[in-house]
């Protein structure tokens, strides 16, 4: 459900949201489990490979429904959590800065940012969790507390952080905790993860402005950016590449075509 906006002026975020969101929830929950090796992380012991696959798939879908709390992954440890909770130590290219956002399924969120003039690169991945080097399957359990995020590289001479914040607020409903549309789970929570004090200040000010436009409470978390784990290549620029069905969507700068998120 989109945010309930108190303002319907021609400059309100509602109009921008309608252009970027393309209606309703993302519905990206059907990504096939085809990615990196699981490294035996939390499937219970079973007698056959087929049973293991079935159990794992069931747990992944429980995670999608927010029911994946299994008491933590056996791969999780204090050392693993400390690594995952460390700062993002990557560095952007000269003249660029990083920004990081969680706003539901990262496929559609990434495409929205790809279209922003001045954005030079986007990556989808996992962050803010308690497991070092998680896989998509790990995150889908809901037990690692990672968020699906987009790390945006932007040219500071051509794009301002405020421009990215505008896209962030327009792209999703920031009032639904751990949910966007049909996608339910902590990996779909709303978050702005800042790299500099200036980004933090801008994020908090923008939240205050957005809250005045809404009649529901914003639940967006604003936290320091933590270690970024790039998602499997399958997920990168997923919609621009056409996804599973080959329906490519434009990543052209300034494009306002509705974003259709599909598995």
From Swiss-Prot:
Chief localisation class: plastid
Presequence extent in this chain: 1-75
Catalytic activity from the UniProt record: L-methionyl-[protein] + [thioredoxin]-disulfide + H2O = L-methionyl-(S)-S-oxide-[protein] + [thioredoxin]-dithiol; [thioredoxin]-disulfide + L-methionine + H2O = L-methionine (S)-S-oxide + [thioredoxin]-dithiol
EC code: 1.8.4.11
Gene Ontology molecular function, alphabetical: L-methionine-(S)-S-oxide reductase activity; peptide-methionine (S)-S-oxide reductase activity
InterPro entries given in the database record: Met_Sox_Rdtase_MsrA_dom, Met_Sox_Rdtase_MsrA_sf, MsrA_MetSO_reductase
GO cellular component, as recorded: chloroplast; cytoplasm
Entry-linked Gene3D superfamilies: Peptide methionine sulphoxide reductase MsrA (3.30.1060.10)
Assigned protein family: Belongs to the MsrA Met sulfoxide reductase family.
Protein name as it appears in the record: Peptide methionine sulfoxide reductase A4, chloroplastic
Organism of origin: Oryza sativa subsp. japonica
